[in-house]
Amino acid sequence: MAVAEIKKEKGSSLSPEPSSPIQILSTEPDANTDIKQEKFTPKDILPGCKVHVSKDGEFRLAEILQEHIKKGRKVFYVHYQDFNKRLDEWIELDRIDFTRSLILPEIKADTKENKSKKKSKSKGQTKLSKNNTTANSTTGTPQPSDGQPIMGDDEMDLENLNVQGLKRPGEEFSREDEIKKLRTSGSMTQNHSEVARVRNLSTIILGEHIIEPWYFSPYPIELTEEDEIYICDFTLSYFGSKKQFERFRSKCSMKHPPGNEIYRDSKVSFWEIDGRKQRTWCRNLCLLSKLFLDHKTLYYDVDPFLFYIMTIKSDQGHHVVGYFSKEKESADGYNVACILTLPCYQKRGFGKLLIQFSYMLTKVERKVGSPEKPLSDLGLLSYRAYWTDTLVKLLVERNSPALFRKNNSQLEYDEAENGKDSSATPTPGPGSNASQSSILASAAASRSGLNSSPIFSNEITIEDISSITCMTTTDILHTLTTLQMLRYYKGQHIIVLTDQIMELYEKLVKKVKEKKKHELNPKLLHWTPPSFTANQLRFGW
């Protein structure tokens, strides 16, 4: 028999609250029956509180960030403690454990010490600003210092750095202030409210893939009330109902991104799209990518950017796998502004292909490049993996011609033998010291997207590595230091190829031989670096 647990207390009613859960028992309760008592009600839940929420079969402590009424149901947006922000989600009441204690937010009272620190800090900042003003107005006159270092334009105050981008108590930011905080390139988020906003879409259906978004994206507000959003994987148009989507697809004839196909091999294709010429498509792409990138902003339009889209082909057409964008004119020498592999295609090597292609374009431009900072956590991992593979392969094979000849394909050897790469590497004439290995190295370097004519030697400079790989010296030094390859020995710097480095090289070669790692072929690239006039680079032209 099922009964409801009823306790008669002073001032309490025998009738339960309509919104309160009632425990159901299969037998009559007795003294030994363990009855779970509710310690709070839904009315007690406020933003900032912490509750235990059912997640993947167990209860996890989560912080309530926001509450909302969606289609007549009360839902809460929660952040799981000690978990990545991309796991934040909307939950309903049935996933909350009301038998465990509700943890209220801590209220930090301003003590006398805190108040005195704030006052002294504000005085120091005022004094510093006065010194800066005087220094700027008077040239050649030294000014007294208060002992605090004055930071340059490229330095960060690590003590006061707001890492999460959340608005601190007492801080107010207008839209104009937020725009002023943006970098001049327009692709980084430094505004506070953008990062702090909660995820607004529950599920998107992209072609045949059902994807759960990670972050907020400014889609139309009417779509946020829908449980599922349908996105066309060719036009990237979005719809709130399946009927609208199917009607659109029955009339849509687009089968690939609206740009020029500049690369195609047996696995992937790349398309170049000008943001000014295809504004709608590129804006839809930015809205989609913002669902999976937390550190980007959409304040600026797409006109100043070129988009390079990677696709795979099926019977239906070319499906977007990922993309990267780059500024038409980058004052800082960045070759990538934003890069993303869609979650349904991640962990399949496509991220490294995007990175390799960006450096392939940089090589054609005869430049060195680096991605715009800061990178996302997944983006940083992908770049570190690419930089590691590139440097390990280059340094090991440069130091050992035997390994180079052993681990490069017979096709490259035949091309070098037959002179098919004579346009890139002139054939040595009589009396030349160039060996057959040098010709082979040139062919393989051209195929891998590196500069031609590598020399087999146990000496190399950082600038040489930069010219071969098109990586910046900063990225090279960062990677060598991370791998613990760069040492200081007897008054000079050396690069040490340890056993761990050789193991990395063998794993890399094994992946290529087993065709687990796809390599792009620069010979299949048909692309000329675009040039723009001053008027074309002007925003809003």
UniProtKB/Swiss-Prot annotation:
Hey, where's the site called Important for catalytic activity on this chain?
A: C338
Spell out the Polar residues composition-biased ranges.
12-30, 131-146
Query: Biological process GO annotation list?
Result: cellular response to stress; DNA repair; DNA-templated transcription elongation; filamentous growth of a population of unicellular organisms; positive regulation of macroautophagy; positive regulation of transcription elongation by RNA polymerase II; positive regulation of triglyceride biosynthetic process; rDNA heterochromatin formation
C2HC MYST-type zinc fingers: which residues?
229-254
A single Pfam family it belongs to is MOZ_SAS
The record's GO molecular-function terms, alphabetically, read: chromatin binding; histone acetyltransferase activity; histone crotonyltransferase activity; histone H4K12 acetyltransferase activity; histone H4K16 acetyltransferase activity; histone H4K5 acetyltransferase activity; peptide 2-hydroxyisobutyryltransferase activity; transcription coregulator activity
Positions of acetyl-CoA binding: A337, C338, I339, L340, T341, Q346, K347, R348, G349, F350, G351, K352, S376
What is the purpose of this protein?
Catalytic component of the NuA4 histone acetyltransferase (HAT) complex which is involved in epigenetic transcriptional activation of selected genes principally by acetylation of nucleosomal histones H4, H3, H2B, H2A and H2A variant H2A.Z. Acetylates histone H4 to form H4K5ac, H4K8ac, H4K12ac and H4K16ac, histone H3 to form H3K14ac, and histone H2A to form H2AK4ac and H2AK7ac. The NuA4 complex is involved in the DNA damage response and is required for chromosome segregation. The NuA4 complex plays a direct role in repair of DNA double-strand breaks (DSBs) through homologous recombination.
Query: What's the name of the protein?
Result: Histone acetyltransferase ESA1
Q: Look up and give the organism this protein is from.
A: Candida albicans (strain SC5314 / ATCC MYA-2876) (Yeast)
Q: Which gene encodes it?
A: ESA1
